[in-house]
């Protein structure tokens, strides 16, 4: 439970925050209806701990990839080889479940630990914990254990399971028995709540919301999903979607205004830059939700507008990193890794927006995406030249966070680049 940041307390659940700058939101046709594997059974008015066992999450039937992949170049294979070596060795650390789930994101549900064991089975067996909802016991993952990150972002495990195509019915060892991915979904639903009137929510803050939103939307069994959360709050996935989009749009407003004025924005401690990966996960979570048919039409327009904003942000933020490296050479290595983080997440987010039907790049925009891919290659080579990839143990001994960034951002760079190249697809 955490108090909401005051900047968005005017957002009320069920009443979409007025976005403003409506001229920035592009008109578009009605969204296509998401496909589901099979018709879902009739749902009750609201799910609760009393009937949640009857909820059957449904994996999406639609699978897509970018319509015009970035043209192949040998440099991409070299960069991916370097990144893959990092992920296969260091994301496969049995003692780092957060890293393992990044390996799953990059390489799919068959990702294996460095010792050859299945990564997902190990994460469930070693780190899942019982989660009680009254007399009902399901499962969940802790934020950390023994100072090791497990789910520093709420619902990271479920989000990655849903995104990489794991069957909700898939079972995993937990304690002396087994549990299913569907059990994790049910628990996530029940523990998700927002009480605007009291300025409280179940997350650690706005930045903590998008993983759960994406997961709940991806496996939603019907076009409407309502539930009574463990605190008694009545929740609706449409409202949760609208609320998340409203937060995203408000925190992006200073960029929209600068873009409309033909100016560059400046980084002055705006909240968006404190969000995970510059707000990329907020965009991705909101994108999945609106593409799956949740939220109001205004929310879909607001998320689609993020594509233009990302194109605008690309050269400005790269220039910020490059200028900082010139001025603060002592921080060059950390800034290079931040550059990798930005580019990998940028390619991942842009590709997802396209696949989800929220953005269709024209020739100029496609060239910009190709430029981002080439910049990622340059960044990987620069990090390699600094000796970071070849001395991961040394990096870890000096700076644990830099080590974690190298592992996690290598995984996102693989996901982003391979989506842009058309080598990976997305189920939605």
Roles of regions detected by a PLM:
Residues 2-15:
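Hydrophobic membrane-insertion alpha-helices, especially the h-region
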């Amino acid at each position: 439970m955490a108090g909401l940041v005051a900047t968005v307390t005017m957002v009320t659940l069920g009443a979409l925050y007025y976005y403003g700058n409506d001229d920035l939101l592009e008109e578009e046709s009605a969204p296509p209806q998401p496909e589901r594997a099979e018709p879902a059974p009739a749902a009750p008015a609201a799910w609760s701990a009393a009937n949640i066992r009857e909820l059957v999450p449904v994996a999406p039937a639609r699978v897509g990839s970018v319509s015009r992949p970035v043209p192949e170049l040998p440099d991409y294979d070299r960069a991916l080889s370097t990144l893959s070596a990092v992920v296969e060795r260091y994301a496969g650390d049995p003692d780092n479940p957060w890293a393992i789930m990044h390996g799953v994101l990059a390489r799919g549900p068959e990702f294996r630990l460095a010792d050859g064991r299945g990564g997902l089975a190990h994460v469930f067996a070693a780190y899942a914990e019982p989660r009680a909802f009254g007399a009902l016991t399901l499962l969940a993952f802790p934020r950390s254990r023994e100072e090791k990150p497990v789910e520093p972002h709420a619902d990271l495990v479920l989000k990655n399971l849903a995104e990489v195509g794991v069957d909700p019915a898939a079972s995993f060892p937990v304690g002396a028995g087994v549990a299913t991915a569907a059990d994790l979904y049910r628990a996530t639903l029940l523990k998700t709540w927002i009480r605007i009137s009291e300025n409280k929510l179940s997350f650690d803050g706005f930045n903590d919301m998008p993983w759960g939103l994406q997961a709940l939307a991806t496996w939603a069994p019907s076009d409407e999903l309502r539930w009574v959360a463990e605190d008694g709050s009545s929740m609706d996935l449409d409202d949760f979607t609208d609320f998340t989009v409203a937060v995203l749009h408000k925190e992006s407003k200073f960029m929209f205004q600068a873009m409309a004025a033909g100016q560059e924005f400046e980084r002055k401690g705006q909240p968006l830059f404190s969000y995970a990966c510059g707000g990329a996960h907020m965009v991705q979570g909101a994108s999945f939700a609106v593409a799956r048919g949740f939220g109001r039409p205004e929310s879909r327009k607001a998320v689609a507008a993020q594509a233009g904003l990302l194109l605008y942000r690309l050269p400005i933020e790269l220039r910020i990193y490059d200028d900082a490296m010139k001025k603060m050479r002592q921080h060059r290595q950390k800034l290079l890794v931040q550059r990798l983080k930005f580019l990998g997440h940028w390619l991942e987010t842009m590709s997802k927006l396209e696949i989800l039907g929220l953005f269709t790049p024209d020739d100029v925009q496609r060239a910009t995406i190709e430029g981002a891919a080439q910049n990622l290659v340059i960044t990987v080579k620069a990090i390699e030249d600094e000796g970071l990839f070849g001395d991961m143990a040394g990096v870890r001994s000096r700076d644990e966070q830099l080590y974690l960034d190298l592992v996690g951002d290598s995984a996102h760079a693989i996901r982003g680049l391979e989506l842009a190249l058309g080598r990976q697809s997305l189920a939605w």
